[in-house]
Amino acid sequence: MALSSSSHLLPFSRPPATFPRARHAGGGRGRAGATGRFIACSSPPPPDVVVTRERGKNAKLIAALEKHNVQSLELPLIKHVEGPDTDRLSAVLRDEKFDWITITSPEAAAVFLEGWKAAGNPKVRIAVVGAGTERVFDEVIQYNDGSLEVAFSPSKAMGKFLASELPRTTETTCKVLYPASAKAGHEIQNGLSNRGFEVTRLNTYTTVSVQDVDPLILKPALSAPVVAVASPSALRAWLNLASQVDNWGNAIACIGETTASAAKKFGLKSIYYPTTPGLDGWVESILEALRAHGQSKEAPGC
């Protein structure tokens, strides 16, 4: 699917169609409920985009889309729960010293901070992936005594760039603690290990699919021309729901390349993602997907 030459988005090209062309939004107006809500100026029109992050974490995206007169349906598809190593984190921080702590997502940052505080705020140096992850540490950095320092972020907000660019701080063994989702791949730890780092990975949280999806919310969600996803886990959860209809084939707008690659592996065709992960690029990806599906948006009138 070609984009204009001025676009910075990188959609996967559309091969001969195995899915029908995306349907425009329509067919049903969902009521507000426990698992989703419309965001609109007055009575809710059919949604333009379904936003799928964990409950409480969609507000910034919804607000950014509202500026473009894009109607969002909030349908949280995943939630974060404790991982098998959650309880070990504070003890490891107390008992061992690391040259780097690598944090790759806002959720990993939030879980790490809980363990770090429980360990008595030991001195740590953090490497982060993404501006959103770094922002989780802002308040702590502002008020702590310098024991926590965010000292590195890679040139591109992706795990493979962190693995290839993280600087060594010693000529001898350089120790890295990697608190991660239990569902995260091994790209970072393998990449660092191949460069001679000694990596300790702790699976401090994981994601599970939300089970109680209101059918009255799901119906308009399945008709929306674009679904926005921020992780392979959310994508899998959406595809499980979309399997209830024949040949669902509307657009997927991914927060970054990792999720987009997962979408391609699942056989989806209409996939959009920004070159640099983050909110602004994600919004542009959603707008590009809407334009491609004949849903061009103007500034809101209310």
Curated annotation (Swiss-Prot):
Species annotation: Oryza sativa subsp. japonica (Rice)
Root EC class: lyase
GO biological process terms, semicolon-separated: chlorophyll biosynthetic process; protoporphyrinogen IX biosynthetic process; uroporphyrinogen III biosynthetic process
Keyword Signal: no
CDD domains xrefs: HemD
Keywords: Chlorophyll biosynthesis, Chloroplast, Lyase, Plastid, Porphyrin biosynthesis, Transit peptide
Function: Catalyzes cyclization of the linear tetrapyrrole, hydroxymethylbilane, to the macrocyclic uroporphyrinogen III, a precursor of tetrapyrroles such as chlorophyll, heme and phycobilins.
Location of the protein in the cell: Plastid, Chloroplast
Domain of life: Eukaryota
Transit peptide: 1-50
Pathway: Porphyrin-containing compound metabolism; protoporphyrin-IX biosynthesis; coproporphyrinogen-III from 5-aminolevulinate: step 3/4
Record's GO cellular component terms: chloroplast
Family statement: Belongs to the uroporphyrinogen-III synthase family.
Catalytic activity: hydroxymethylbilane = uroporphyrinogen III + H2O
Name of the featured protein: Uroporphyrinogen-III synthase, chloroplastic
Molecular function GO terms recorded: uroporphyrinogen-III synthase activity
Chain residue ranges for the region called Disordered: 1-39
EC number: 4.2.1.75
